[in-house]
Amino acid sequence: TLRSLGLKMGDRVVFNMPNILENIYYTLAAKRLGIIYTPVFGGFSAKTLSDRIHDAGAKVIVTTDSGYRNAEIIPFKNAYTDPALDDYIPLQAALSVLREIISEFDISETGESLFKKVATSLEGEITIERSDLTLALGAALSEESLLDAEVTARLRTHVAKRLAKISHSIKKVIVVRYTGQKTADYARDVSSHQLVDQSRKRMRKFLAIKTLDALNSLSEKDFWVAMNSFCRAKPVEANWPLFFIYTSGSTGKPKGLVHSHGGWLAGITHTMRVIFNATKSDRCYVIADPGWITGQSYLIAAPLSFGLTSIIAEGSPLYPQAGRFASIIERHKVTIFKAGATFLKAVMTDPASQGDVEMYDTSTLRVSTFCAEPVSPAVQKYGMESICQNYINSYWATEHGGMVFSCPWGGYKTLLADAKTWPLPWIQAEVRIATASDESGQVIEWRVAEEGEKGELVITNPYPYLARTIWGNTDQLFELNWCGDRGRFTEAYFTRWRGRYSYTQGDYARKGVDGGFTLHGRSDDVINVSGHRIGTEEIEGAILKDKTIHRDSPVGNVVVVGAPHQEKGEIPVAFILGVNGRKLNDDDIGRLKSLVRSEKGVTAVPSDFLTVSAFPETRSGKYMRRALRSILIDEDLGDLSTLRNPHIIREIQETINIWKALRDVTESAHIAKSWRYIRFE
């Protein structure tokens, strides 16, 4: 099917679908042909999808008419795919148009000034709405008094007309008809079902098989032989890019982490045996979306490569009632279970939800594991007592490719509810404390942390399934030594510590006397919301866009930090520096939330906006984010000697204390309302 559209080795495709079988079919098809794919989570906004399509240089996107989530229809094509392709255009293409048009007008120095102002105001974007550029141009023109009204009007008209002609690089949109919802039809759209039917007909003709029933009646071995003769797998070098998956960084645009055909697949398959002692008779249920690395690694690739059964379930594990995930375990006799801790936190804090779970038999489980976010001993204790006796804790991230810390099932340790996890046999790790840094932030002196001392977790040796690079430098993709954006990859993960090999993910940890590690969240400016990593700079950029859209915006500047949340782990909280001391009203807050939702998706929307008169600022002009976060979590503020304005700390503390008090009242009212109405329903 993919080959029939002219796709070949090295071409890129984007998958934006719910957790359905077609998502897996197309993933496996791309792997077979050496086509490089990038999965995009269905909860992201059209803007985020547009950015990733363009950054990937994709030719084809595969989507669905809709999906289901908590008894609601999620219109993938109408809400995400079509707006991503129609409403957004590549920034560089838009700037090229602007430069060309300016050169056609005899405005020389004024034109160059206009261009620089527009380019600066849109800096950091990958794709933009056409109105973003016209608004930026309008703002720049209002500052240039040398141009008369006629020239200004003609310039803006020419730009608007030319911008309308710019489009994305996508040639075809494959649409999977899943829910049957009506969608808009475009010339670029092709039906997945029609493409598959045509491929079946070509295959039957090639194999001289008259009917579809005859094709389906072939034995597994005969079908494999037939398929391999009809569509041979494309041989690729072991380090050829298999897929890249985007993750948020503390600064800059999201990073497309590249995983390879050889090392990644071999590594994650091996973890199934080492961690779970898996056999081909096991049934594995992973609560994950293919748009995240957990879905790629342990929902799809590792179980299928190992030869065991993977259970796929669309929607929330807690809907229509909290016992849904347990009912799936009972019904399908699941033996291996893997999920983040967020959903279990929601269950254990609600007696009614606990009762829902207890209705089902989960005794077939041999081993379960947490992933994606730090786990507390209390959550692990509940999991061990209520779900599976062997409920272990595993640690890894998108960059790691697969689990790097865990506790091999039935292995060398008596399992305790202490949230500890151990490096796998091929992982060498330590916790470090920085003692001296240079001006660039690189640690030039450090020591290994004492037992129980909190520091930064560092992996000190390479291993096969670690990400190879960051997606980039695509012009050299077919060169023998292609390394993607190697400079950015090295800068992001390998330059924190001076000296020997050191891979730094950006997480705090403690090492115990028994060699086990406990994880304590991020050490950089990334927020982990229910296992979804979001860069604070991404959220800040979306909020600051309000200044471009609304000339009367009250937003002067913004700093976003993560606040602890009982169920989600962390939630974004935005500190706003108001223009001329202005406060935000309800309309402002609603508008800013809507803006972040449309730009970055629902998980990025701050829970609250707190107005302050200034941010904690160092003498070098940098905002001290850690001070804001320390106040939020009632943590020791540490060394504040570098602050230029230490007096602002007390004001911010008072603001946060008022916010906490109001939040407690709101949560109490919400709980009472839930018990009065929702439980009754």
What does each of the following model-derived ranges do?
Residues 166-181, 187-246, 253, 263, ...:
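Conserved pre-ATP/AMP-binding loop-to-beta segment of ANL
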Residues 34, 260-283, 287-335, 349-351, ...:
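Conserved AMP-binding/adenylation subdomain of ANL enzymes
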Residues 15, 41-65, 330, 337, ...:
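AMP-binding/adenylate-forming catalytic core of the ANL superfamily
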Residues 559-565, 572-577, 590-681:
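Conserved C-terminal "lid"/linker of ANL adenylate-forming enzymes
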Residues 4-5, 28, 32-215, 340-341:
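Structural core segment of the AMP-binding/adenylate-forming
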Residues 190, 195, 203, 207-213, ...:
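Gly/Ser/Thr-rich phosphate-binding loop
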Residues 17-18, 38-54, 66-68, 72-75, ...:
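ATP-dependent adenylate-forming carboxylate-activation enzymes
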Residues 437-495, 516, 532-535, 636-637:
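Conserved ATP/PPi-binding loop(s) of AMP-dependent carboxylate-activating enzymes
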